[in-house]
């Protein structure tokens, strides 16, 4: 019975997160920073190249040093081209992975199923995360949780 409840929590977290954020697959590039990060950045649009990788580790184009973000965007463009829909979905999947990881870690640390599920659901669905899920260039918070 307990295993069924845990699987049910994972399922509900997955379905609710996808239900809320699935619409981003139809979003376009944002007018704020996406041009610097993707749509007008030839290093990113070229995909993963040696020059691009070197650039990712040596640039502070936007005032930040975040090579993992650049490499991730390059990989996205390598796989999907300059199409924002799949890149948005990658952000959703990263957010979902973070949500499930949070639930697993909290459950392991506390042994409490329902409080862990509640915190993970609040993390997954809180409006504060809309920006970091729906905006292409905000991969930093998605990757930061893994460390």
Labelled PLM ranges:
Residues 1-147:
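Polytopic membrane enzymes that build or remodel cell-surface glycoconjugates and lipids
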């Amino acid at each position: 019975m307990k295993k069924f409840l845990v699987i049910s929590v994972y399922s509900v977290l997955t379905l609710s997160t996808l239900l809320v954020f699935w619409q981003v697959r139809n979003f376009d590039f944002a007018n704020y920073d996406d041009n610097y990060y993707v749509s007008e950045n030839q290093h990113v649009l070229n995909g993963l190249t040696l020059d691009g990788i070197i650039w990712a580790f040596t640039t502070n184009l936007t005032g930040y040093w975040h090579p993992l973000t650049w490499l991730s965007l390059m990989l996205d463009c390598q796989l999907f081209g300059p199409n924002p829909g799949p890149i948005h979905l990658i952000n959703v999947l990263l957010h979902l992975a973070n949500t499930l990881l949070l639930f697993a870690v909290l459950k392991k640390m506390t042994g409490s199923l329902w409080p862990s599920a509640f915190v993970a659901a609040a993390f997954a669905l809180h409006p504060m995360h809309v920006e970091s899920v729906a905006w292409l260039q905000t991969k930093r918070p998605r990757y930061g949780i893994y460390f």
